[in-house]
A protein has these predicted regions:
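Short, mixed-charge amphipathic alpha-helical segments
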Residues: 110, 173-203
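Charge-enriched, short contiguous segments at helix-coil
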Residues: 191-257
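Generic recognition of stable, solvent-exposed alpha-helical segments in well-folded globular domains
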Residues: 81, 114-117, 129, 133-140, ...
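Eukaryote-specific, cytoplasm-facing alpha-helical/coiled-coil scaffolding segments in long proteins
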Residues: 148, 167-171, 233-238, 252-264
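Secondary-structure-rich domain cores
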Residues: 92-178
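The feature captures two recurrent sequence modes
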Residues: 1-69
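Charged alpha-helical initiation segments
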Residues: 49, 61-132, 254-263
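Sequence termini and other peripheral, non-core segments
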Residues: 4-6, 262, 266
Length: 266
């Protein structure tokens, strides 16, 4: 399981941006027209215009949408190839129970108080192939995790109304809070914003909230990528995980993939 976290690398925003611009310049005809992003029900969820042919960086917001879309395509491939294979090997080798995940969730400062068992159970489901059930727990819990971090660093996570009542801000607003961006890895925030909440990205959180996502979709591509991304996220702040890595000669000398983790499934 720790080897799985070593194989996973959060992609840098700058690398995604350079890839989008590079592909646009190398294949201008293929990127001359916009495209409609369609969900599983055949509905158009977003009309994505093309980038400016003279200056792809002219509209930063539009460029960001293309970055989410480009990242999604790579995430689907990674999920369907190396992550699906790696998870299958894990299932064939082990039957994961909650105790095997203690090292990941116990005393992990990033997990909100009282949510350790929830994460533990969801990850057990995910690693044992119960993907549909796992996604329905992990997506809202990861959203709450980032809300909690934002609160801890002084970000305002609610909108105050004139009558004195308050309403929780939407996830995209939470992940864009200056306080959160100042204190947390922006590449990780970008990844989870695309996975959970962007129509140009995977939009997993909203598809789950509206009952759109299918059982099959939860067992493929970007959903597998999301599940492994959550494991990686938790491993970064797990003291036990750090100690295991520190004391294991095999894990200590593992070569972290520089660019594309697809090369590690041999």
């Amino acid at each position: 399981l720790i080897r799985l976290t070593q194989m996973f690398v959060f992609e840098k925003q700058e690398d995604i941006k350079n890839r989008v611009i590079g592909e646009f310049k190398d294949y201008p005809l293929a990127h001359m027209f916009g495209k409609n992003l369609i969900n599983a029900q055949g509905q158009t969820v977003l009309a994505l215009p093309p980038l400016d042919i003279q200056n792809p960086e002219k509209d930063p917001y539009l460029l960001e949408l293309h970055m989410y879309q480009n990242a999604l395509e790579k995430q689907k491939i990674s999920g369907d190839i190396w992550m699906k294979n790696a998870l299958a090997i894990l299932r064939d080798t082990y039957v994961v129970d909650n105790s095997m995940l203690d090292f990941l969730v116990k005393d992990n400062p990033i997990i909100p108080e009282g949510r350790e068992h929830i994460f533990q159970s969801a990850l057990r489901m995910f690693l044992n192939g119960e993907f549909y059930e796992a996604m329905h727990i992990l997506a809202p819990q990861v959203e709450n995790l980032f809300r909690n971090i934002a609160k801890e660093v002084g970000g305002l996570t609610v909108t105050l109304k004139d009558d004195g009542s308050s309403m929780e801000k939407v996830l995209s607003s939470i992940l864009s809070l200056p306080e959160l961006l100042d204190c947390y890895d922006n590449d990780i925030l970008f990844t989870f914003r695309g996975l959970l909440n962007e129509q140009a990205g995977a939009n997993i959180r909203n598809e789950i909230a509206h009952g759109i996502i299918s059982e099959y979709a939860c067992s493929t591509g970007v959903c597998l990528y999301f599940g492994v991304a959550v494991i990686k996220l938790l491993s970064l702040t797990s003291v036990s995980c750090y100690q295991i890595l520190k004391n294991s000669k095999k894990l200590k000398h593992f070569e972290v993939p520089k660019k594309d983790a697809l090369k590690v499934i041999h």
